[in-house]
């Protein structure tokens, strides 16, 4: 016993082996002598020293270590060094993504060098020990993805620190009391790192740069989500002041230079709570029987000069952000909600695509022009839907209203709205016939009280009134892209930001095929674009209304490439368009403003714009779009958890919406809130995940949980900080 105590507690061979691995991994490339190793690991007894020497010898057989001399070793990195991106996971399963697009490689916490998610790093590959997965270790952090972090302050008498959500770091960020900037215990705050850990300093040291307010306050929590993604939660005063100086007056020169549509029936159709009206539609019948449909878009580029302080802020933001209870606009409120917004009964400047359509919705002619419009009516989608249904339209069938009765269609401007709907449905049918992919996704919505609390939770799906607007916006975007990009063979098109969507990823399509075959479905994983699209549409139709439908749609969406902006056109797979851009939402998307400016430039005989400059802007806008989407999803998750937090202990009918190796996802039938039943809480048996058949099977009683099964759940936990709901199976 005496010998065991001298060097501290006894150590097994496995424990000592792990300590030796960690020690060598922490000092890649360094030759370490027995003396240094024994001292660092406090191996004071002869048996422990001999055991360490034996283990190191075995490690040379595994190619984990290289013997340098009789009494020194070093880590065998095999000289493999690569650069790439570090991906941090809250469960400790961090990974390294090589720049060359290779397979992600595991990086243990001890080998991460305090890298944070998204950091550019250099790694060396550790020699793989027998029965061990391939591992990398960070040897240099090339570029930090960020140096500011958002979290909750804990302040006591002796110290203060920041707790980050999702456990960004193994240890919390220590904050000197003098650097709190007035922050109090339980406040949400933004902290900047002053000192990263290194060989001499083991702690993260930070300072508060902004205090957001007390945890739990609705405004504070929404601003926290924005801050976590580096999105602005306040508008710079100088930019707002610049917007105040802009006049909304329409001059005689404006009238002289623009087509006047103020006498043509025009309306906007938007969500009930919308304030920024980007687009309007006008319609009239021409003497030749054709329909003149105008797609009128707010002329933002007339008011926002390229390179101005407002423009620079818009570039930085690149998009408006739509959280559950608020909009964070790309442009100052005076512009997006007033001057540019196509409000009813006000003269407005627009950039318009005017179509002449025959009765079959074939485009017989078009022109792209600057206009002055005056919206006669501001409709909510629900109002238009009511008018359509009052005149015989059955939502979702794709069928237009029957022929007008003797007294005409019922409702305000019903004849015009019914005609627009009929033309839109013809356009939609042509698009799907050409190979467009059909994904009708439902979105979770909340009714919010005056304090920002969710009081109702429900799904909203796109209806015929939504699709009416969508089809004319798609037509305008496509036409604008063709007007610049579609040129004679052998000539080079002028620079334009396109909205591109590549063909599905073949490997992910194969994953989809393997997944759906378990449910008896098929899908084409190769072939022409049209064949793949038709196959995907058949799959969506076949599984519609089935228990597995939601999960199949989710896996199918993951097989799709992400749409993005680029000056290098490859077409749009999902829409089946060879040319497509974004022209119709310049109030909330910067690429649309770019397109407006370039159209004007080229219409005035200007030369092609700098391709490299516009590609850089496209890449930035694509990145910011993803950031905004993630923030929007987080706000939905937060409100869902907040909604259920007051219902702890309550039981609900639900159905199984997802199954993984670590538990069951269940969606409540009544309100569509989704939570997880961890595997450890399925206490009636020990369950195995059957990956082939996508179910859990009990070892003793052989009870099975599978997709779509009805299940009675009890709300167990609601973690607002992590935005997670936990359920248990109700007794």
Spell out what each predicted region is.
Residues 39, 190, 195-197, 214, ...:
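Electropositive polyanion-binding surfaces
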Residues 103-108, 169-175, 672-689:
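A short macromolecule-binding patch
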């Amino acid at each position: 016993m005496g010998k065991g105590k001298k060097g501290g507690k006894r150590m097994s061979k496995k424990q000592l082996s792990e300590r030796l691995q960690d020690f060598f991994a922490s000092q890649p490339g360094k030759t370490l002598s027995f003396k240094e190793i024994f001292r660092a690991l406090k191996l004071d007894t002869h048996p422990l020293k001999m055991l360490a020497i034996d283990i190191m010898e075995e490690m040379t057989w595994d190619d984990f270590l290289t013997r340098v001399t009789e009494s020194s070793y070093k880590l065998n990195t095999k000289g493999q060094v690569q650069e790439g991106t570090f991906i941090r996971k809250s469960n400790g399963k961090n990974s390294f993504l090589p720049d060359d697009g290779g397979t992600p490689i595991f990086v243990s916490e001890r080998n991460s060098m305090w890298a944070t998610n998204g950091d550019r790093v250099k790694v060396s590959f550790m020699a793989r020990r027998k029965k061990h997965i391939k591992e990398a270790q960070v040897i240099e952090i090339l570029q930090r993805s960020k140096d500011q972090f958002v979290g909750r302050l804990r302040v006591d008498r002796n110290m203060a620190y920041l707790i980050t959500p999702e456990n960004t770091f193994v240890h919390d960020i220590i904050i000197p009391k003098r650097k709190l900037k007035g922050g109090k215990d339980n406040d949400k705050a933004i902290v900047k790192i002053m000192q990263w850990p290194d060989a001499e300093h083991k702690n993260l040291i930070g300072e508060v740069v902004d205090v957001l307010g007390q945890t739990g306050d609705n405004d504070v929590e929404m601003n926290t989500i924005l801050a976590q993604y580096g999105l602005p939660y306040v508008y710079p005063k100088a930019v707002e002041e610049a917007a105040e100086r802009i006049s909304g007056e329409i001059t005689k020169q404006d009238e002289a230079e623009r087509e006047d549509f103020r006498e043509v029936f025009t309306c906007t159709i938007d969500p009930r709570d919308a304030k920024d009206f980007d687009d309007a539609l006008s319609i009239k019948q021409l003497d030749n029987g054709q329909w003149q449909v105008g797609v009128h878009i707010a002329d933002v580029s007339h008011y926002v000069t390229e390179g101005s302080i407002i423009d620079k802020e818009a570039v930085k933001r690149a998009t408006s952000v739509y959280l559950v209870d608020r909009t964070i606009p790309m442009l100052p409120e005076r512009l997006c909600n007033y001057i540019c917004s196509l409000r009813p009964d006000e003269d407005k400047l627009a950039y318009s695509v005017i179509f002449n359509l025959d009765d079959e919705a074939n485009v017989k002619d078009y022109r792209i022009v600057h206009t002055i419009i005056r919206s006669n009516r501001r409709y909510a989608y629900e109002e238009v839907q009511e008018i359509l249904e009052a005149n015989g339209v059955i939502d979702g069938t794709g069928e237009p209203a029957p022929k007008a009765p003797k007294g005409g269609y019922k409702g305000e401007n019903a004849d015009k709205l019914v005609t627009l709907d009929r033309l839109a449905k013809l356009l939609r049918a042509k698009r799907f016939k050409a190979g467009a992919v059909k994904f009708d996704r439902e979105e979770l919505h909340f009714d919010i009280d005056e304090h920002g609390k969710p009081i109702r939770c429900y799904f909203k799906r796109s209806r015929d009134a939504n699709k009416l607007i969508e089809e004319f916006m798609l037509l305008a975007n496509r036409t604008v892209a063709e007007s610049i990009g579609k040129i004679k063979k052998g000539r080079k098109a002028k620079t334009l930001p396109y909205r591109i969507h590549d063909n599905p990823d073949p490997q992910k399509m194969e994953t989809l095929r393997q997944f759906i075959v378990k449910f008896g479905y098929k899908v084409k994983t190769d072939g022409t674009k049209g064949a793949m699209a038709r196959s995907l549409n058949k799959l969506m139709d076949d599984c519609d209304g089935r228990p597995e439908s939601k999960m199949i749609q989710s896996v199918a969406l993951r097989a799709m490439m992400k749409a993005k902006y680029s000056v290098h056109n490859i077409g749009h797979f999902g829409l089946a368009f060879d040319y497509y851009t974004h022209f119709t939402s310049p109030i909330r998307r910067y690429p649309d403003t770019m397109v407006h400016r370039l159209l004007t430039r080229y219409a005035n005989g200007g030369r092609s714009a700098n391709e490299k400059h516009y590609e850089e802007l496209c890449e930035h806008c694509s990145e910011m779009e993803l950031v905004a989407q993630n923030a929007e999803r987080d706000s939905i998750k937060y409100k869902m958890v907040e909604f259920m937090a007051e219902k702890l202990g309550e039981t609900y009918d639900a159905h199984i919406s997802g199954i993984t190796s670590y538990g069951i996802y269940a969606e409540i039938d009544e309100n569509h809130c989704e939570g997880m039943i961890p595997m450890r809480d399925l206490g009636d048996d020990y369950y195995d995940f059957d990956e082939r058949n996508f179910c859990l099977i009990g070892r003793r009683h052989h009870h099975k949980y599978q997709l779509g099964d009805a299940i009675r759940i009890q709300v167990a936990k609601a973690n607002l900080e992590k935005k997670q709901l936990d359920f248990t199976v109700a007794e």
